[in-house]
């Protein structure tokens, strides 16, 4: 989480870090309100008043076999280091990325570099296949054995419920 000067505290997801560059992290921010807009206006070397984290639980990584990682929107950001770690552990990684349209598909290049297969789904069909993230996941489950399934949001509420079923 970070606090921009005269802005609210907002949770942010670390999409990567570089241990060779002390203190360097990669954040993904969707510009939707005052604080996120101010954050997006910062330049390299600018100051952020307060940064707290990382927060939460680390994802357990081991060699599972075939792993499907599915997410949409900014929910894809926390998936990236996990996909990279799963691949490094020797898994076959299939990534399903989703967004409302082509412009909202993020980190595709980076996901392709660490995945055996990437399936793109867009609500409007402007890129990849038209449909929800769940349809991409169902395609994989129908054709092959999946040993582990990981899902990340933000995606539609109904998609999260379907992925949980």
Task: List each language-model region with its residue ranges.
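Ferredoxin-reductase
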Residues: 1-46
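FNR/FR-type flavoprotein reductase catalytic core
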Residues: 34-165
